[in-house]
Amino acid sequence: MRAAGLPVHVRYSGAGDDRKPLALFVHGHFGSSRTWSGLTALLSGQLECVAMDLPGFGRTPPPACYSTTAMGDTVAAVAEAISDEPVHVIGNSYGGTIALWLAATHPELVRSLTLISPAVSLSPAGLTMRKCLTVLYRLCAGGAGLRRQLSGKDARALTDAVLKECCMDSSGIDATVFDVAVADVREALRNPARITAESRSFRALAATLMRFHFPGGSSLRRVARRITVPTAIIWGEGDATVPVRHARRLARLIPGARLAVVRGTGHLPQLEAPQRVAAIIAAHIAHIAEHPARV
């Protein structure tokens, strides 16, 4: 489909029943629409699921601008293209930050919001400031710098290392889901434009997250307070990328937000405990359908 002047690749599951609520899934870094395949398979009986490739990721070509605003505008255009009614929006990590921005700036397009460990902090648990700055430098060094760092890396070994870093126990991830993650990483390693997308989008995210701590209308803190749609926040108890303390902080900022902390999981609970995450999402959306006047 075309959205915001760009051809955007989307994947449907659970389609064919107009009575089903429609949900739009937004992935994070080193991901694509395929990232959601395990979760959408569990939800496709209750929802019509649409997972998109963000600009520069998967099969969607690179955009002119990687700012959070520009990415959010593309997601908004996709939401308008897939439905005449507001849709349920679900995002993880970087995709969660974009989904948060979308709900605050385009509430007319969003029926509900589900944030799964959204990226709302620049200070991962256990990292010293020096290490934080080193990580930021490497990720923001530009596509060429990131390509040099990843040159010669094996996709399966790199995926395994990343998942071990992000998850409390990556050994429990379904083998098919792991293979999908490997395919995404392999695609990124082979495609210079994809590495550029990873680097430039992370640089834009870093700028957005820095504004979380500053006053002004563009601060992420103020953006969160503007959200009026029903919101569920799902967070891994052992998230070392964005510690769970930020979940409670974010839940206090978003009016009426409901927080579910998933035990035994890290930054990717939808991969680590898909059944539990699917149940939380399904219950959240069902509650909205059953009590439309109360949400």
Regions found by a protein language model. Give the residues of each.
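Acidic catalytic loop of the alpha/beta-hydrolase fold
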Residues: F214, G238-V242
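Short beta-strand/loop motif that positions the catalytic acidic residue
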Residues: I227, I233-W235
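Conserved HGGG/HGGXW glycine-rich cap/lid loop of the alpha/beta-hydrolase fold
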Residues: L6, R11-P61
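Short glycine-enriched nucleophile-adjacent loop
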Residues: G96-P107, L113
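Catalytic active-site module of serine/aspartate enzymes centered on a nucleophile-bearing elbow/loop
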Residues: P255-V295
